Structure formats: structure tokens, C-alpha cells
């Protein structure tokens, strides 16, 4: 990558507080774009709208999903917007390119029984289970992003208000409450997990060496929990975030409150969680609709 692209990624990291995972995606998108430029003998600063359309066709020819293509085009549009702020002679070739429509997927979430099974897996009275349980509790109890989790400091935990202050996207702070189970797991972890007691930093979640845990480390922990849990086949941090939102809405929480807890800027982003479970929809329907049941049915 050239120095402009490197400066762009650094701006996303420092000024916009992008996570490691998101930055890696942006970097991969730029590398793939550079490979296309080299293959077609094109220059970054003379790239035109016609070339952008050809690049769109090139991406589709690689049998990528529309969501992936959409993200890659968005990355390049954002990159050129950044470059334009540095050089008035640069034109954004992607600004008029029609965004491919995204496939709509319902967010995946865990049922309450599945969450109970996951928590039972980390009930063992071991040092590692103390740490693993606090990760699981915080992600499910608060719905925070994994990038927010790994940056929590000990002083961000408020045991008086029973909640945590996190730094979200765009460096925006928000306070998210947690319940009694989460509080207890944090207290047990701080009191009995030896690596956290001997470290020389303030990060809350650490690995077995006492070092601040990484996003990759959190994913490893969650995958390890799943391997030891019968009846649960897949997990990722965002699935726990989906579960948090879905369970709140299923129990009657209003959309605006969930939006605030998740740290979403737009209500439409939170709206995808109103799918609730099919089982919950049918339960509400049967109880609410006058002609949902015949008189002799229960």
C-alpha cells in the first residue's frame, strides 16, 4: 500500500476508533483494489468512474456475496473521500457508483435455554472459568461490542450504579447497566483471578499471562466454551449482541431503549432486531388475536 492508504487506515484507527477487525477488513479491501490496479495497469490518482464500474464487475466475477461487494465499494468510496480532503485535484470515482443491494438476513441469536447451557459450561471452580464467565456475562448482559469489551478498564466498572462505561464507535461514551449475575461474576473475577491481581495495567479482561486480552483472544475463549457445550454449535461476539437485543425486545423493551443500550446512531439499525423469534411471534399472536383459536382449543 502507498503512504496515502496507510495514512487513511491510521486516521480510521486514531480518530474514528475503528476496531482491529474492521481495520483489517479495510486493509484487505485496499490490497485487493491495488492488485486490480496492477493487473489492469491503472493508476490510483487517475482512476475514473468507468474504471470503478469495471472493478465492480471484477468483484462480482469472483463470486462474492453482495454484502461483501457492497462493503468493498464503501471502503473505496470512503478512502477517496479522505484523499479529497488532502488533494483538491482528486475526484472520487465511486461516488456515483450504485451500491449493490444487500441481501437481508435475520440476525442469529441464542435461545434462553442455549444461553443457560453456555453459562453452565463455565461454572467450574477454576481460574480460567472465572475469566471466561466474566467475558460471557459482560457480552450477554450488556450487548457491548467485542472491541468495547477489550478496552474496558477497571475504573469503568461502577458497582454503585451496577453498570459499565464503554467507548463506542466514533469515540462516543455510553453507560450500560448490568444485572446481579454479571456483577457477581466481575467481583469473583477481580477477587480470585490471580493474573488480574499481578498485572501493571488497568484493563479489566486479561489473558492467563495477565496481558490485556485481544479481540482474537475473546473469540478463542468463546469458541472454546462452545466446544465444551452440548447442543450449541456456533458462537461469535456479535451473536451475543444479537441475543442481548432480541431477548430484551422479546420481554417488552422498547426500541429506543435498546437503541441507546447498543449505541446505535440510527433507529433503523436497531430495527433489524424486531424480528424476535418465530416462537415468540406465534405465542403473542395466539394470546392476542380474537380468532386465533377455536372455542374448544386451549
Swiss-Prot record:
GO CC annotation terms, alphabetical: cytoplasm
Pfam hit, one: Phage_int_SAM_1
CDD domains reported in the protein's UniProt record: INT_XerDC_C
Keyword Translocase tagged: no
Active site: 145, 169, 238, 241, 264, 273 (o-(3'-phospho-dna)-tyrosine intermediate)
GO MF terms, alphabetically ordered: DNA binding; tyrosine-based site-specific recombinase activity
Position of the signal peptide: none
BP GO annotations: cell division; chromosome segregation; DNA transposition
Location relative to the cell: Cytoplasm
InterPro entries xref list: CB, DNA_brk_join_enz, Integrase-like_cat_sf, Integrase_catalytic, Integrase_recombinase_N, Integrase_SAM-like_N, Recomb_XerC, Tyrosine_recombinase_XerC/XerD
PROSITE patterns, alphabetized: CB, TYR_RECOMBINASE
Name of this protein: Tyrosine recombinase XerC
Organism classification: Bacteria, Bacillati, Bacillota, Bacilli, Bacillales
Gene name as annotated: xerC
Amino acid at each position: 500500500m502507498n503512504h496515502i492508504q496507510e495514512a487513511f487506515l491510521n486516521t480510521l484507527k486514531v480518530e474514528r476508533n475503528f476496531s482491529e477487525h474492521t481495520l483489517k477488513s479495510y486493509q484487505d479491501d485496499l490490497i485487493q483494489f491495488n492488485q486490480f490496479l496492477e493487473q489492469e495497469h491503472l493508476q490510483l490518482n487517475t482512476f475514473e468512474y468507468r474504471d470503478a464500474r469495471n472493478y465492480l464487475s471484477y468483484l462480482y466475477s469472483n463470486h462474492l456475496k453482495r454484502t461483501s461487494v457492497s462493503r468493498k465499494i464503501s471502503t473505496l468510496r470512503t478512502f477517496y473521500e479522505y484523499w479529497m480532503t488532502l488533494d483538491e485535484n482528486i475526484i472520487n470515482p465511486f461516488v456515483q457508483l450504485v451500491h449493490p443491494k444487500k441481501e437481508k438476513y435475520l440476525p442469529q441469536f441464542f435461545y434462553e435455554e442455549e444461553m443457560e447451557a453456555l453459562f453452565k459450561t463455565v461454572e467450574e471452580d477454576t481460574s480460567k472459568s472465572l475469566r471466561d464467565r466474566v467475558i460471557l456475562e459482560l457480552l450477554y448482559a450488556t450487548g457491548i461490542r467485542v472491541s468495547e469489551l477489550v478496552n474496558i478498564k477497571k475504573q469503568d466498572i461502577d458497582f454503585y450504579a451496577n453498570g459499565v462505561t464503554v467507548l463506542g464507535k466514533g469515540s462516543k461514551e455510553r453507560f450500560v447497566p448490568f444485572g446481579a449475575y454479571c456483577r457477581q461474576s466481575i467481583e469473583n473475577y477481580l477477587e480470585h483471578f490471580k493474573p488480574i491481581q499481578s498485572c501493571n495495567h488497568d484493563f479489566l479482561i486479561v489473558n492467563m499471562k495477565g496481558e490485556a486480552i485481544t479481540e482474537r483472544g475473546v473469540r478463542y475463549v468463546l469458541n472454546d466454551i462452545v466446544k465444551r457445550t452440548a447442543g450449541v454449535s456456533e458462537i461469535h461476539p456479535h451473536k451475543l449482541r444479537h441475543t442481548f437485543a432480541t431477548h430484551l425486545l422479546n420481554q417488552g423493551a422498547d426500541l429506543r431503549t435498546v437503541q441507546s443500550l447498543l449505541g446505535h446512531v440510527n433507529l433503523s439499525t436497531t430495527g433489524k432486531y424486531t424480528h424476535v423469534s418465530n416462537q415468540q411471534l406465534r405465542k403473542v399472536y395466539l394470546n392476542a388475536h380474537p380468532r386465533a383459536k377455536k372455542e374448544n382449543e386451549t
